[in-house]
Design a protein with these regions (language model features):
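Glycine-rich acyl-CoA binding loop
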Residues: 91-94
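Conserved GNAT acetyl-CoA-binding A-motif
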Residues: 107-116
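Conserved active-site tyrosine of GNAT-family acetyltransferases
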Residues: 128
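GNAT-family acyltransferases
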Residues: 1-78, 83-86, 99-103, 107, ...
Length: 150
């Protein structure tokens, strides 16, 4: 578990992920979260790198999720994150991503963390730039790719 001033961030258990997936009403999210659970089950020794990470306030209120999308052969881990609409604009994304990226960059096999963001998602781009992520000049399926190295 990662704790910040206002947040608790932790990799969900198999049961928590199953419950979370079952509650999803958006098919594309349900499929993505199912793929994460499949990654966890296929790589139990690297659970954190495939799991849904829950973002909660200190009182246990669930406000969002983040995830790493595995580790590639170069030691790069992609992060994805989202904060529920009711909690946006309060710095929670910056706080959660700062803590998660700091944790990731302390891990032995990690050289950098990347994030792919929709070009129109100005708030998410601001979060990444504020945290020292730099554009790579590459465009992924969702949009520009940003990178932060050790």
């Amino acid at each position: 578990m990662i704790e910040t001033k206002r947040l608790k961030i932790y990799a969900a258990s198999e049961k928590q992920m199953e419950t979370f997936i079952a509650a999803q009403s958006v098919d594309v999210l349900k499929a993505a979260y199912t793929e994460m659970l499949d990654g966890c089950l296929a790589h139990p020794d690297r659970w954190e790198w495939y799991a849904i990470w829950m973002i909660e306030l200190k009182d246990g209120t669930h406000i969002g999720e983040l995830c790493f999308k595995g580790i590639d052969e170069s030691g790069s881990a992609e992060i994805g994150y989202g904060i529920s609409d009711d909690y946006q604009g309060r710095g929670y994304a910056s706080e959660a991503v700062t803590a998660a990226v700091a944790w990731a960059l302390k891990q032995e096999k990690i050289n950098c963390v990347t994030a792919e963001v929709d070009k129109d998602n100005v708030a998410s781009i601001r979060v990444l730039e504020k945290l020292g992520f730099k554009p790579t000049g590459r465009i992924g399926e969702e949009g520009p790719i940003y990178r932060k190295a050790k």
